[in-house]
Amino acid sequence: SERVRLQNSGDYDEIYIMLQDGTGQAVQLTSNSDSYKYSLLWSPDSKKILWSDRLFRLRYIDIDKKQIVEVAKGKAWEIRDYTWSPDSSWVAYSQQELNSINKIYVWSLADGKTIEVTDNWYSSYSPCFSTDGKYLFFVSDRDFNPVYSRTEFNHAYLAMSRIYLVTLTAEVKSPFEPKSDEVKIGTAIETSKGEKSDIEKASTPAKTAAEKVVVKIDEAGLRDRIVDLPIEVASYSSLTSVGDRLYYIRRNMAERQSSFKYYDLGKREEKDLGQITSYVISADQKKMLVAQRREFAIIDLPAAPIKIEEKLDLSGLEMWLDRQTEWAQIFNESWRQMRDFFYAPNMHGVNWEKVRAQYE
């Protein structure tokens, strides 16, 4: 029932939370910030907010304690790719190394331990925990199929990526292990007490994501448990796990178009869902907001190509504007961005404070 917002307070934005209906007073969580913040992300238990900043830090704040904890600090660049585990006890993120390769790490909130998931040989990114906490999905560039030019003695690597998963504990079996074809004789379909038979129990849906999940990670042999999904080489993004399904957007570089798909780990098959621009799955994992160009719709989680029948009517949206306040914010934000993002810290000798005063 709460929402988070960034509000300018001094030189940098601060994090506030407030009720969704706008009633009551907003609660300020951070103060005296020293850098730009990126991509605020609530934890699944709604007790923490994770973000990264211009100073290469990845941090979260405990809502109740109002305590900021540093998860990691980038070695070569900003950390812009991160996610929570379903039990809010781990953070997975990718970080650019000094050799320009992106590596995936997981960090434990319990003891502050950092574990390397991938190595320095292949760039890996877009980590995504499975909803049951057994796997970590990610994208990695491990295929080298050069395309040669007809006019130059040169080649380029256009399609290098696949989706991979790693089983987080040694006890969890890979979903791609050979299946046993042994037939077991179950009990009768109907029992005298009306209880479910063995056959019925086997077909009962798994526990919902709302039930408690505890994520455990065995560091020993972690990289040896990495396997690739049997899908084509392309560019992948927007990984989201729901039960046995992993939703993602694939871009085929040869065809220059994107397609929306999911892979079913139980059935070991990929399904095409058509073409969309982007999507977001609701917290209860029952609904999906999809965008097709400039049109939006809320639909049930799809299992077949998407056909938008009821589009969201956004014609009634209104925005309250204070033009003078908005113009002042635009001016101040432009000044701050030049100060913080200009490649030369000394601004080429220009007195930047004086420039601000000159135009205010």
Residues covered by each model-derived region:
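Blade-terminus and WD-like Trp-Asp/Gly-His loop motifs, strongest in beta-propeller folds
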Residues: S1-R3, S39-K48, Y82-W90, S126-Y135, ...
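A short beta-strand motif characteristic of beta-propeller blades
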Residues: A26-T30, Q67-A72, K113-V117, V227-L229, ...
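A flexible loop/linker signature enriched in serine peptidases of the S9 family
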Residues: L6-Y16, G22, T30-K37, K47-I63, ...
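Intrinsically disordered, Ser/Thr/Pro/Gly-rich linkers and terminal tails that flank
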Residues: S149, D228, S238-S241, Y248-E360
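A short helix->beta-strand "capping" segment at the edge of beta-propeller domains
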Residues: A26, V213-E232
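Blade/loop signatures of beta-propeller domains
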Residues: Y16-M18, S203-L222
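Generic, well-ordered alpha-helical scaffold segments in large soluble proteins
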Residues: M18, V91-S94, W107, N120, ...
